[in-house]
A protein has these predicted regions:
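Helix-hairpin-helix/helix-loop-helix acidic hairpins
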Residues: 1-48
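Residue-level detector of well-ordered alpha-helical segments, enriched
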Residues: 2, 48, 52, 123-128
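Short alpha-helix boundary/capping elements
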Residues: 5, 60-64, 136
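Compositionally biased, intrinsically disordered low-complexity regions enriched in proline and serine
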Residues: 22, 31, 47, 53, ...
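Catalytic DNA-binding helix-loop module of base-excision-repair DNA glycosylases/AP lyases
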Residues: 35-85
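C-terminal accessory module of base-excision DNA glycosylases/AP lyases that mediates lesion recognition
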Residues: 69-140
Length: 140
């Protein structure tokens, strides 16, 4: 039921509106993330699918905007990466954020972007997610 509901939400969107949400997440206040991560109406386990929402947006951008800057518009929201972010925040002496604050996708994105900005080597949001996830998977 939850998957069907998410499909209905996506199918309700006009193609140009969907592409606009994907192309300009900040300018649309991450509206597509909000739409996809609203709690489902599943009778047994209604869920708020923030991880799915971010992955959908991330991979849709990779598909629709391949080779363009917009292909990296959405970092994947993941509990492993979320749990590792405070280590990077401390290392780079960035503004501290609580784990609860990092549950907000916009705050999560801002944190990822700050860390990437302070990294010694250029790295994409996608690259950062993969490196952190691979390193910390099984270590937390």
């Amino acid at each position: 039921m939850g998957r069907e509901e998410l499909c209905r939400r996506l199918l309700k969107l006009d193609r140009d509106v969907l592409l606009g949400y994907l192309k300009d997440p900040e300018g649309t206040n991450y509206r597509l993330i909000d739409i996809l991560s609203e709690q489902t109406n599943a009778p047994f386990r209604p869920r708020r699918n923030l991880s799915f929402a971010s992955k959908f947006c991330h991979y849709a951008c990779l598909a629709f905007f391949k080779g363009k800057e917009a292909q990296d518009n959405y970092p994947v929201y993941d509990n492993i990466v979320k749990g590792a972010l405070p280590k990077y925040i401390a290392y780079f002496s960035l503004n501290r954020r609580s784990q609860a604050a990092l549950s907000d996708y916009q705050t999560y994105c801002e944190c990822v972007d700050e860390i990437i900005t302070h990294a010694d080597e250029p790295i994409s949001r996608n690259g950062f997610d993969h490196l952190v996830w691979c390193y910390f998977k099984g270590r937390q």
